[in-house]
């Protein structure tokens, strides 16, 4: 499912780094707290042909290796001197309604499909910051409640512009999921088919899409900042062949204003991991 929460999940890891400007000092811990508010114009659900405006809260805190984030959840990350890093998070997924919803994915044309419940998950990511402006990462997200399957992504991030005031970042990710995951979000079982009128569809596991994000962050001073992002998602055949997918090419826009409370002087770096020997 690449809509609202899922698309935000692509954007927020970059937004987290850009807005909190985590210090990368081998001899000192880092910490900051950022709040903000924004808006997002995105598909009602992955594959929807209708868009919706949503309010996007921003809440991000960091103390050394540990962090909390309104989109990612809570977790920690570590990086060695070679640039390899590891991240572990405990997060959530808002699921999907079978009617129009203002704070989660859902649309009236899904009536009869039933709701996909809110669930807890854990995510494991391993990546390499090859250069100050280039990083690659592999990530797996596993459900802890309401078995909805496992999703994976392989991504790389480029940062062509990075100054004291402005950061521009581009991220592209290939998206994968197991059979259970794809059928949770794109499949139509016999009971759903009977209730909704959609034809049956059993989605095979594997590659199901590509997500691209372009993000511009501007810092007015030590506290006030803005973040603008544009996202484009293309759904592969495993998702696009589902009868509930009405549009395979999706776009989303996000804008947010942030306020950062600094606990110490920091400099913006990516990916913002705490280094270990």
Regions found by a protein language model. Name each.
Residues 62-64, 77-79, 127-129, 157-161, ...:
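Structural signature of outer-membrane beta-barrel channels/translocons
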Residues 41, 120, 150, 208-210, ...:
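Transmembrane beta-barrel architecture of outer-membrane proteins
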Residues 25-76:
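Short glycine/proline- and aromatic-enriched beta-strand/turn motifs that initiate or cap beta-hairpins
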Residues 56-58, 156, 248-277:
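Outer-membrane beta-barrel "beta-signal"
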Residues 28, 70-171, 179-204, 239, ...:
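Outer-membrane pore/translocation modules
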Residues 225-256, 273-276:
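C-terminal/domain-terminus segments
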Residues 1-30, 48, 262-277:
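Cleavable N-terminal export/targeting peptides
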Residues 31-37, 57, 66-68, 86-88, ...:
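Transmembrane beta-strands of outer-membrane beta-barrel proteins
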């Amino acid at each position: 499912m690449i809509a609202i929460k899922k698309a935000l999940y692509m954007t927020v890891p970059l937004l987290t780094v850009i807005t909190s400007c985590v210090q990368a000092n081998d001899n000192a811990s880092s910490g900051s707290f950022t709040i903000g508010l924004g808006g997002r114009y995105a598909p009602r659900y992955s594959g929807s042909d209708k868009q919706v405006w949503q309010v996007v809260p921003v809440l991000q805190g960091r103390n050394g290796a540990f962090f909390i984030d309104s989109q990612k959840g809570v977790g920690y990350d570590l990086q060695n001197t070679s640039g390899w890093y590891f991240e572990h998070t405990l997060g959530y997924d808002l699921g999907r309604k079978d009617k129009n919803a203002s704070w989660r994915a859902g649309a009236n044309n899904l009536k009869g499909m039933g709701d996909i419940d809110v669930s807890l998950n854990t995510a494991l990511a391993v990546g390499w910051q090859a250069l100050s402006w280039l990083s690659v990462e592999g990530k797996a997200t596993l459900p802890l409640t309401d078995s909805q399957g496992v999703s994976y992504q392989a991504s790389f991030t480029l940062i062509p512009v990075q100054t004291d005031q402005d950061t521009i970042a581009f991220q592209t990710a290939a998206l994968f999921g197991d059979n259970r995951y794809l059928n949770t979000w794109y499949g139509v079982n016999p009971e759903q088919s009977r209730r909704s009128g959609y034809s049956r569809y059993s989605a095979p596991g594997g590659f199901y899409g590509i997500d691209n994000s372009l993000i511009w962050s501007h810092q007015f001073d030590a506290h006030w900042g803005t973040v603008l992002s544009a996202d484009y998602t293309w759904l592969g055949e495993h998702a696009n062949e589902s009868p509930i997918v009405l549009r395979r090419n999706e776009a989303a826009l996000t804008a947010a204003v942030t306020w950062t409370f600094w606990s110490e002087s920091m400099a913006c770096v990516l990916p913002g991991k705490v280094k270990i020997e």
